[in-house]
Amino acid sequence: XSNATDETXLKDVSA
């Protein structure tokens, strides 16, 4: 990822 969400724990934006 790239977004903060992905950094925290791989959310929807995990591709």
From Swiss-Prot:
- The answer, when asked if Mitochondrion is one of the entry's keywords, is yes
Listed A to Z, the keywords are: Membrane, Mitochondrion, Mitochondrion inner membrane, NAD, Oxidoreductase, Translocase, Ubiquinone
Q: Which domain of life is it from?
A: Eukaryota
A GO-annotated cellular component: mitochondrial inner membrane
**Localization terms from the record:** Mitochondrion inner membrane
| UniProt function note | Transfer of electrons from NADH to the respiratory chain. The immediate electron acceptor for the enzyme is believed to be ubiquinone.
What Enzyme Commission number(s) appear in the record? 7.1.1.2
| Chief location of this protein within or outside the cell | mitochondrion
Bilayer topology term: Peripheral membrane protein
This protein is called what?
NADH-ubiquinone oxidoreductase 20 kDa subunit
Oligomeric form and interacting partners? Complex I is composed of about 45 different subunits.
Q: Which GO terms describe its molecular function?
A: NADH dehydrogenase (ubiquinone) activity
* Catalytic reactions of this protein: a ubiquinone + NADH + 5 H(+)(in) = a ubiquinol + NAD(+) + 4 H(+)(out)
Enzyme group, top EC level? translocase
Organism of origin is Solanum tuberosum (Potato)
